[in-house]
């Protein structure tokens, strides 16, 4: 079966939980979370939940697992906490939970960041994606430029296809 045939079998609507990881953002100042939601809604997807979670490993794991275990959620999208500062713990929180990792997401995101956005600073991005409890999980940096790049070039074009692949044998 071709990639196009797989995409045709993918769901039209993906139910998503959006998590902004930040010690400082609020509902009023969370530009990147709102941008992520806007891209998802414009693509016809449904926002099942949205929250802002502090840069704390246990709190992040609880929030991600709650989304992944919710039968009304097909994907969890995080923004923030992917850098190399001590408080950036998103990757440490979610990667141990992955049953499968999608290394191509981070690799291609960094390549696009290098060529189209921030140049050599892309080496500090630890964006990643994987599968937790038959749920797609994507983690992007928290800058609005990074969210826009990830959503436009990678997540929106493949989100439904990824969900289809994860759930086809379930």
From Swiss-Prot:
It holds the Pfam family MoCF_biosynth. Pathway: Cofactor biosynthesis; molybdopterin biosynthesis. It comes from the Bacteria. The keyword Iron-sulfur does not apply. SUPFAM superfamilies: Molybdenum cofactor biosynthesis proteins. Keywords: Molybdenum cofactor biosynthesis. GO terms for cellular component: cytosol. The keyword Cytoplasm does not apply. InterPro entries: MoaB, MoaB/Mog-like_dom_sf, MoaB/Mog_dom, MoCF_biosynth_CS. GO terms for biological process: Mo-molybdopterin cofactor biosynthetic process. Belongs to the MoaB/Mog family. NCBIfam families: molyb_syn. May be involved in the biosynthesis of molybdopterin. This is Molybdenum cofactor biosynthesis protein B. It comes from Bacillus subtilis (strain 168). The lineage of its organism: Bacteria, Bacillati, Bacillota, Bacilli, Bacillales. The gene is moaB.
């Amino acid at each position: 079966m071709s990639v196009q045939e797989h995409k045709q079998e993918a769901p039209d609507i993906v139910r998503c939980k959006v998590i902004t990881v930040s010690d400082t953002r609020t509902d009023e100042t969370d530009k990147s979370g709102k941008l992520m939601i806007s891209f998802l809604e414009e693509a016809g997807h449904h926002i099942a939940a949205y929250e802002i979670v502090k840069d704390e490993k246990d709190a992040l794991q609880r929030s991600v697992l709650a989304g992944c275990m919710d039968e009304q959620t097909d994907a969890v999208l995080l923004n923030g906490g992917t850098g190399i500062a001590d408080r950036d713990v998103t990757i440490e929180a979610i990667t141990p939970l992955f049953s499968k990792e999608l290394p191509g997401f981070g690799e291609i995101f960094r390549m696009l960041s290098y060529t189209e956005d921030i140049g050599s600073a892309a080496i500090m991005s630890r964006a990643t994606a994987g599968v937790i409890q038959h749920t797609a999980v994507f983690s992007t940096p928290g800058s609005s430029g990074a969210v826009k790049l990830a959503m436009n070039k990678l997540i929106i074009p493949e989100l439904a296809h990824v969900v289809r692949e994860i759930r086809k044998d379930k």
